[in-house]
Design a protein with these regions (language model features):
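Accessory alpha/beta interaction modules
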Residues: 1-152, 162
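Conserved phosphate-donor/acceptor-positioning beta-strand/loop module used by diverse small-molecule
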Residues: 156
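Short, charged alpha-helical interaction segments and adjacent helix-coil junctions
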Residues: 1-7, 15, 74-79, 166-266
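His/Asp/Glu-rich acidic catalytic environments and adjacent acidic regulatory segments
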Residues: 159
Length: 266
């Protein structure tokens, strides 16, 4: 059977998203479309950034990590499944960003500003907004007590219809929903060509092979832990089910990707 490259291997797949937006001009365009008021003109981009999270004793891989000349940190993550605890997931990524937001010897008031941005192909909160942004209140009963934590938790809804967004962001959200269309902008056509080039490359095959190995290792570990705890089936979900959400994110995200990508080979 001939593979339909446009069906499963879309821009919402983590490695594909990270690769396409590893190019500074693509990353800059995306950030400008999401945060036009910041006037971002340049930045250092690190796709699929690996950070060692000592608390969990494992490496954590970020989809798209960027820092501008003012020291602001931007972490953009594709979220393709509904989450039981989105707030915990934001907190988890925030804890990782905080590792880079204050250098040793700096005062607390020098802590960098961070933007954790989740992009969803569905409406995560069901209110129809294009963009949801969280706020921290020092007094839950007083909406005027918003704390300036220098953190921004932003959820972008590809299915949104309420609120104002840039035309560039709307183009990108339409691309997530519909793929390439006759109305797609030149930028969307460009990143779609880069997506196709990537999934036809040896680099993509190597990346997918690494994910397949990761899945195999996770299944083996799950079976081992499942036997130890007397579970009937030692599948990956069985292993992860009894742990905190913060301990799920790093590997489970990619395990899920491999499963979806494997379907595209059928």
């Amino acid at each position: 059977m001939v593979r339909n490259e446009n069906h499963n291997l879309t821009i919402t797949r983590d490695p594909i998203f990270g690769h396409v937006f590893s190019k500074p001009e693509n990353c800059l365009h995306l950030l400008q479309s999401i945060l036009p008021d910041l006037g971002i003109t340049e930045g250092e981009v690190t796709p699929q950034k690996q950070l060692n999270k000592k608390l969990l004793e494992k490496n954590v891989i970020m989809d798209l990590w960027a820092k501008n000349k003012d020291g602001k940190i931007f972490d953009v993550e594709m979220q393709t499944t509904k989450q039981k605890w989105p707030g915990v997931r934001f907190r988890y990524y925030q804890s990782i960003a905080d590792q880079d937001s204050l250098k040793p010897g700096e005062d607390l008031d020098q802590i960098g500003e961070t933007y954790i941005i989740f992009i969803y192909p569905f409406d995560p909160f069901g209110e129809g907004k294009y963009i949801y942004e969280g706020a921290f209140l020092l007094d839950k009963d007083n909406p005027d007590s918003q704390a300036n934590t220098k953190t921004h938790w932003i959820s972008i809804n590809a299915r949104g219809y309420k609120g104002k967004i840039t035309s560039e962001l709307k183009d990108f959200l339409n691309y997530i929903k519909y793929g390439l269309t006759k109305d797609s902008s030149n930028f969307i056509k460009k990143i779609d060509r880069e997506r196709l080039d990537y999934i036809r490359s040896t680099e993509w095959r190597d990346a997918k092979m690494s994910l397949d190995v990761l899945l195999t290792d996770e299944r083996a570990e799950a079976r081992k832990e499942g036997r130890k705890e007397g579970r009937e089936e030692g599948i990956v979900e069985g292993k992860l089910e009894g742990k905190l959400e913060a301990q799920r994110i790093g590997v489970k995200k990619f395990v899920q990707n491999v499963r979806e990508l494997d379907q595209s080979d059928d």
